């Protein structure tokens, strides 16, 4: 067995799998179990590193969410919410349907993040991984985009208030982290950075580069919208061009990163054209930023990712591996993992850590797309550096 870091905590419990709208819903937390078992089978995760999530309290949830919204979620948990209330709080459609005990299961996701926050801020661990979290669309008073409670925003506010720390949120999910952004739009203790597919063609339709915050929060919101069909080289170039100036200027005490893996070309809900190469590189760069600017303090969350068999387990494994300073993996996946899950998978499981790319489509407009992305990224970096001096 490889040597494991005792300074990294990994949140997992089968209770996290209960956050489930219905059997056919694209948000499927089985991806968390698939990832965890892959790490265990590959001897990359030690059981001693796993910590159990607690249930967040009402006061903790209301660091971000409105009282009436939390009460509505409690009522919906038991099927006692009216149609008008369900509509008001975003609980009346297939996207964010009601399910039994949804308050408790959602609060458990939040509690997992807060558990890591306390462990890190008390010096018991250096960093943490919460792949079951990353629900960045939830608004203070409304469910949205498969998200009930915004665990990232709550954790950021918790750390800012309880520990008087400056928090930077780095969101690389294909969808704009709108719920998190609006929670801190007029705040200067939390900075939000989101690089995502442009909202011109993708939910939630926000995240334009001109969304920069307001009042004392002006300049503390940074958005980098990318063109559809953006490929690896362009995504990574724009990410690195824009994110490090933000870190240097804001000088956070801790980073929270949202590691949605729906930028992958196999993801069914988005239009980006990246591969596992980007998804492996991103968390390692965030880890570099944390080591360089926050004394290593970082919590890495999950996020989007809807190809749960061929993409999420391999990509999310590297989120954890970046935290424990293990190298990017190559070669064959553990046979134990393949042999167990091949009976459940709706498609052929991968055999190797690398993408085969046998079905990858190269886009003729790659150069045009990349040039447009870079031009915007340079503009954003220049604007940010000039306004923060």
UniProtKB/Swiss-Prot annotation:
Listed InterPro entries: AcuC (IPR003085), HDAC_PDAC (IPR050284), His_deacetylse (IPR000286), His_deacetylse_dom (IPR023801), His_deacetylse_dom_sf (IPR037138), Ureohydrolase_dom_sf (IPR023696)
Function: Role in growth on acetoin or butanediol. Involved in the breakdown of these compounds used as a carbon source.
Signal sequence extent: none
A Pfam family this chain is assigned to: Hist_deacetyl
Record pathway: Ketone degradation; acetoin degradation
Protein name according to UniProt: Acetoin utilization protein AcuC
Lineage: Bacteria, Bacillati, Bacillota, Bacilli, Bacillales
GO MF, one annotated term: histone deacetylase activity
Family in the record: Belongs to the histone deacetylase family.
Organism field: Staphylococcus aureus (strain Mu50 / ATCC 700699)
Keyword GTP-binding set for record: no
UniProt keyword terms in alphabetical order: Acetoin catabolism
Keyword Repeat found: no
Example GO biological process: acetoin catabolic process
Listed Gene3D superfamilies: Histone deacetylase domain
């Amino acid at each position: 067995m490889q040597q494991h870091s005792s300074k990294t905590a990994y949140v997992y419990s089968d209770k996290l799998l209960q956050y489930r709208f219905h059997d056919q819903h694209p948000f499927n937390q089985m991806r968390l179990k698939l990832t965890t078992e892959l790490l265990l089978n590959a001897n990359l995760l030690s059981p001693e590193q796993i910590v159990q999530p607690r249930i967040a309290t009402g006061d903790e949830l209301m660091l971000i969410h409105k009282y009436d919204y939390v009460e509505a979620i409690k009522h919906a948990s038991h099927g006692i919410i009216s149609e008008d209330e369900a509509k008001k709080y975003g609980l009346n459609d297939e996207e964010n349907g009601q399910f039994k005990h949804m308050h408790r299961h959602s609060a458990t996701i939040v509690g997992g993040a807060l558990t890591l926050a306390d462990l890190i801020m008390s010096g018991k661990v250096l960093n943490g991984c919460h792949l079951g979290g990353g629900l960045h669309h939830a608004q203070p008073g409304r469910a949205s985009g498969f998200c009930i409670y915004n665990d990232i925003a709550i954790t950021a506010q918790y750390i800012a208030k309880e520990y008087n720390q400056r928090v930077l949120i780095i969101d690389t999910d294909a969808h704009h982290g709108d719920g998190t952004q609006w929670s801190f739009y007029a705040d200067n203790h939390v900075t939000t950075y989101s690089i995502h597919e442009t909202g011109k063609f993708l939910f939630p339709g926000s995240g334009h580069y001109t969304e920069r915050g307001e009042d004392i929060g002006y300049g503390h919101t940074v958005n980098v919208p990318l063109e559809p069909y953006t490929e690896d080289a362009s995504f990574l170039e724009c990410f690195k061009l824009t994110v490090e100036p933000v870190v240097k200027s804001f000088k956070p005490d801790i980073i929270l990163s949202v590691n949605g893996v729906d930028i992958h070309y196999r993801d069914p809900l988005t239009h980006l054209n990246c591969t596992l190469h980007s998804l492996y590189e991103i968390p390692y760069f965030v880890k570099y930023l944390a080591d360089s600017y926050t004394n290593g303090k970082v919590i890495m969350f999950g996020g989007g990712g809807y190809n749960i068999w061929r993409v999420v387990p391999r990509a999310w494994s590297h989120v954890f591996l970046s935290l424990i300073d293990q190298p990017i993996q190559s070669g064959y996946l553990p046979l134990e993992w393949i042999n167990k899950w091949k009976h459940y998978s709706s498609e052929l499981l991968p055999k190797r850590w690398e993408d085969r790319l046998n079905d990858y489509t190269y886009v003729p407009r790659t150069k045009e797309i990349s040039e447009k992305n870079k031009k915007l990224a340079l503009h954003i970096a220049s604007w940010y550096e000039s306004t923060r001096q």
